[in-house]
Amino acid sequence: MYIDITIDLKHYNGSVFDLRLSDYHPVKKVIDIAWQAQSVSMPPREGHWIRVVNKDKVFSGECKLSDCGITNGDRLEIL
């Protein structure tokens, strides 16, 4: 299923943008897509951790979005 999420890169370049993608992707792939979309020069931190701001939960890069419970409208802060 495709979901619309907001990506927050405040720890890197400060940008916030929306993505529409499959919830079958692992968190690590979502971070790779965000890096390509925003041309971020610094590499992501080890482990590819994210925080789902509106649900106050933290997940590692190995978890699939669907397994993490990430759905439409969630805001992902890349740590």
Curated annotation (Swiss-Prot):
It comes from the Bacteria. InterPro entries: EsaB, Ubiquitin-like_domsf, YukD-like. Disruption phenotype: Cells lacking this gene are blocked in YukE secretion. They display an increased bacteriophage SPP1 resistance phenotype. Belongs to the EsaB family. Required for YukE secretion. Probable component or regulator of the ESX/ESAT-6-like secretion system (BsEss). This is ESX secretion system protein YukD. It comes from Bacillus subtilis (strain 168).
